[in-house]
Curated annotation (Swiss-Prot):
Domain of life from the UniProt record: Bacteria
Family note: Belongs to the UPF0232 family.
InterPro entries from the UniProt entry: DciA-like (IPR007922), UPF0232_actinobac (IPR023007)
Protein's UniProt name: UPF0232 protein MSMEG_0004/MSMEI_0006
Basic and acidic residues biased stretches: 30-52
Disordered: region residues: 1-81
HAMAP family tied to this protein: UPF0232
Biased composition range(s): Acidic residues: 1-14
C-alpha cells in the first residue's frame, strides 16, 4: 500500500544532517528551544524586532477578572489629550518638526508678523531657511527691507530659531509691454504710478 507522498518524499536511506557540536548533547524540545534562541539572538544583532511568536486573543478567566478603575481627579495618561499636543508629539516622534515649523511660518503669517504687514506682503516660498516675501508695491518692499531684522526676530520667537535664517523681499512683478521679437530697454519697472 502506497501513500500520496511516497513518490515525492525523500528516500528513507537519506542521511540526516548532524547538529553542530555545541548542540550535539541536546535532544527533542531542548534542541528546538536552543536553536530558536540562537535565531532570535542573530535577528537582534541585525537590529530586527524579535517577538514571542503569535499570541491569541487575551483569555479571561472567570475568577481573575480585574475591575476597571476610574482615572481619579488628577491628571492621568488615560485622560483626553489636546489635539495640538498630540499632533506636536506625533510630529516630534516622526521627525516632522522642521517641516511643520516651515509650514507654520507660511500658514500663520498674519499671526507671526501682524495685520499691517500681512495686508501688504505675502510669503511665497521657504527653501533652505530663505523665506521669499512678495510685497504689493516697491514702497512696501523697501519698508520691509528696513525692518527685516525685526521680522526675523518675530518669526524666530513664534516658530523657533533656525527655521528662517534670511528674508528675500521682492516687489511686485510689473506689467510687461513687450511685444514682438525685438525689444528696446524701457525706464525700468513701473509698478506704481505716482
Amino acid at each position: 500500500m502506497t501513500g500520496p507522498f511516497d513518490d515525492d518524499g525523500p528516500e528513507e536511506d537519506a542521511p540526516v544532517p548532524a547538529p553542530p557540536d555545541h548542540l550535539a548533547g541536546l535532544r527533542g524540545i531542548d534542541l528546538v528551544r536552543r536553536t530558536l534562541e540562537e535565531a532570535r539572538g542573530a535577528a537582534r544583532s541585525q537590529g530586527k524586532d524579535v517577538g514571542r511568536g503569535r499570541s491569541g486573543p487575551a483569555r479571561r478567566v472567570g475568577g481573575n477578572r480585574r475591575r476597571r478603575t476610574w482615572s481619579g481627579p488628577g491628571p492621568d495618561a488615560r485622560d483626553p489629550q489636546l489635539l495640538g499636543a498630540v499632533t506636536q508629539d506625533l510630529a516630534k516622534s516622526r521627525g516632522w518638526s522642521a517641516r511643520v515649523a516651515e509650514g507654520s511660518v507660511i500658514g500663520r503669517w498674519r499671526a507671526v508678523v501682524g495685520d499691517q504687514i500681512a495686508d501688504h506682503a505675502t510669503p511665497t516660498a521657504l527653501n533652505e531657511g530663505v523665506l521669499t516675501v512678495t510685497a504689493e508695491s516697491t514702497a512696501w518692499a523697501t519698508q520691509l527691507r528696513m525692518v527685516q531684522s525685526q521680522l526675523l526676530a518675530k518669526i524666530a520667537a513664534v516658530v523657533g530659531d533656525g527655521v528662517v535664517t534670511t528674508l528675500k523681499i521682492v516687489g511686485p512683478a510689473g506689467p510687461s509691454w513687450r511685444k514682438g521679437r525685438y525689444h528696446v530697454s524701457g525706464r525700468g519697472p513701473r509698478d506704481t504710478y505716482g
